Regions:
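Repetitive helical segments and hydrophobic/amphipathic motifs
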Residues: 10-11
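Bacterial N-terminal signal peptides that target proteins for export
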Residues: 1-7
């Protein structure tokens, strides 16, 4: 797989091989295959040896020192038992000792549609592949969505189980409020505030939980809309969890990171901004946009990427 690597920027890449919605020209998300993802927070392409067996991946990958193409040391793959709770320093994702870290793993598809993959065995298998993070994609609007006709208790239980399975396997986990077809995250902001307050209260003492408060603002949602939403939801998390990393989606299906550069969220630490990239659809213009934002010092977290087209 190929991914974007930029100098001096903490980038988490979660690559998804099924469509998760149209960015720029997509209309709906495919509800077919589970998404595979990969994350990076490195200065150059990861050159780790692909010949390691699964046992070595499980026992070594979490603390493995990565190198860049010129042989210089880069960030390390992280695990909660060694690296503890993560935070943001400048544009970088770092561990409890301020060492740059790398996360890479998978994102589920909609929890309501594919609950059978939220098991300890699945997480253990992902761990054996070298994954150290799982993104729990909980749709909010679509069929079975948390804010529409979904069973909220069932969805919360799936999230809670996922957090525990990640902890069991020494992995990080992202609780993803998967805004998509509703477009503007403010539509269900009151529900989001209640949900994230509940999650943060439950997991404030955990060192492996990251919150993603809006997957893909779209359909005309502006950065002003997203920033207002963030100002409403972030306090619900910070009331209980003072320093967890919080990810904020950007307009245009999380492509317009340049908007966040011009007017970032202020008053809170450990904030990152998401960018989504699909190689068959998004070309050099999006890479240039990412590079410009990174050069400006924006903490960027690529919470979805795929080698397919944006519409699956």
């Amino acid at each position: 797989k190929k991914y974007i690597a930029l100098v001096l920027v903490a980038v988490l890449v979660l690559g998804i091989f099924t469509g998760c919605g149209n960015k720029g020209n997509k209309e709906t998300e495919s509800q077919t295959d589970e998404k595979a993802t990969e994350s990076v927070n490195s200065a150059e392409n990861n050159t780790e040896d692909s010949t390691q067996n699964s046992t070595e991946n499980q026992n070594v990958a979490d603390t493995e020192q990565l190198t860049t193409e010129n042989g210089q040391e880069s960030s390390v793959l992280a695990c909660p038992s060694v690296n503890g709770k993560l935070h943001v320093e400048g544009s970088k994702l770092v561990d409890q000792n301020n060492n740059e870290v790398q996360l890479r793993g998978v994102s589920t598809h909609g929890l309501a549609w594919y609950p059978q993959y939220v098991t300890n065995d699945c997480f253990a298998t992902l761990k054996s592949f070298g994954a150290n993070v799982v993104r729990l994609a909980m749709y909010t609007y679509e069929s079975g969505g948390y804010c529409t006709d979904g069973d909220r208790q069932r969805l919360e239980t799936l999230v809670q189980n996922g957090v525990q399975y990640a902890l069991n396997n020494d992995m990080y986990v992202i609780i993803d409020w998967h805004v998509l077809n509703e477009g503007n995250p403010n539509r269900y902001s009151d529900v989001a505030k209640t949900f994230f307050a509940k999650m943060a209260q439950q997991y404030a003492s955990y060192n492996n939980v990251i919150y993603e408060i809006c997957n893909e603002p779209c359909n005309g949602a502006t950065w002003g809309d997203v920033k207002f939403y963030a100002s409403e939801v972030i306090p619900s998390i910070r009331s209980y969890d003072k320093d967890a990393v919080i990810l904020i989606g950007t307009p245009n299906w999380s492509q317009d990171v340049d908007e966040a550069v011009k007017d970032p969220v202020t008053g809170y630490d450990n904030i990152m901004y998401t960018l989504h990239f699909y190689a068959a659809t998004h070309k050099e213009d999006l890479q240039n946009k990412l590079k410009s934002a990174a050069d400006a010092g924006l903490p960027i977290f690529v919470s979805e990427f795929g080698i397919c087209s944006a519409d699956g």
